[in-house]
Design a protein with these regions (language model features):
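Membrane-interface amphipathic segments in extracytoplasmic regions
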Residues: 1-270
Length: 270
């Protein structure tokens, strides 16, 4: 058996589990993952240690939690055990991919491992001299690399995970995260943790109260400088008659798996 490296484990989005803690938390990047991780660590008395280890809370998850001997095996046993309640935090797929796009614009253009791939993709389409990337182009890029089996980035992959989703007892929509986690605590006899103080993260890109993006925002090539100068647009501005069908096609598996919570019309109205 090939031994997984730390980077490989990090990319797997393994659930959060602790022996003796009654909840297994399944999650996806760009779906409240930092808040859920903090909630989990607080319940297990590890949050202070994790924040001391690194300002970026996921470093503790990657370097410490996922590196524990037998951790993946524990995950696989736990999701099949009646001793654990398995929850998964999910997010409207349209809102999530907008968040991924804004995150790319804000912080990932320089360090993102896909930057060279995106640059090549643009050059092949005669866009090599274009500065930045529009939301429409971002969705086209995701579609194209997915067709070639190269959609490596968990921020861009669908949320549905065949390894874990079939074992989930309850879906917790990010839009109702506080209530969903409180209900989990009630059912499992856990003390209440107020997530309000845990929800702030440096990688959130909240919409500006006032922005100056053009009406046809989804076709507008943007960079981090655009966010500084024009503000952060609301998701509803980027989700239009062109991009909504693209999102629906790319993340159809999520819409089918989480149809109880998310429909196309809701995605557009958000």
């Amino acid at each position: 058996m090939v031994r997984r490296t730390a980077a490989r484990r990090a990319s797997l989005s393994l659930p959060l589990v602790r022996e003796g803690f009654p909840v297994v938390c399944c999650w996806s990047p760009k779906a409240g993952c930092s808040t859920v991780l903090k909630w989990f660590l607080q319940h297990n008395g590890e949050l202070e240690e994790a924040l001391s280890y690194s300002p970026w809370i996921h470093n503790y998850r990657i370097d410490r939690l996922f590196q524990e001997p037998g951790y993946e095996q524990l995950c696989r046993r736990a999701v099949r055990s009646d001793r654990f309640r398995v929850i998964k935090v999910i997010r409207d797929p349209a809102q999530r991919v907008v968040s991924a796009y804004l995150h790319y614009l804000r912080v990932a253009q320089q360090d993102w491992q896909g930057s060279n791939m995106l640059a090549t993709w643009k050059a092949e389409r005669g866009l090599g001299s274009q500065e930045g990337c529009s939301f429409r182009q971002f969705l086209q890029f995701i579609r194209d690399i997915d067709e070639f089996g190269s959609l490596w980035d968990p921020h861009l992959r669908p949320q549905y995970d065949r390894s874990w989703d079939p074992h989930v007892d309850a879906l917790v929509p990010l839009e109702n995260l506080a209530a969903g986690l409180a209900e989990t605590e009630r059912l499992c006899g856990l003390p209440h943790v107020d997530i309000q103080s845990l929800s702030e993260s440096v990688h959130h890109n909240r919409p500006s109260r006032q922005h100056r993006w053009p009406q046809d925002a989804s076709a507008f090539p943007a960079t981090s400088k655009t966010l500084d100068e024009l503000g952060v647009p609301p998701a509803s501005l980027l989700l239009d008659e062109t991009t909504i069908p693209m999102v629906r096609a790319q993340y159809g598996i999520d819409y089918r798996a989480y149809a109880e919570h998310y429909q196309l019309r809701a995605a557009r109205a958000s």
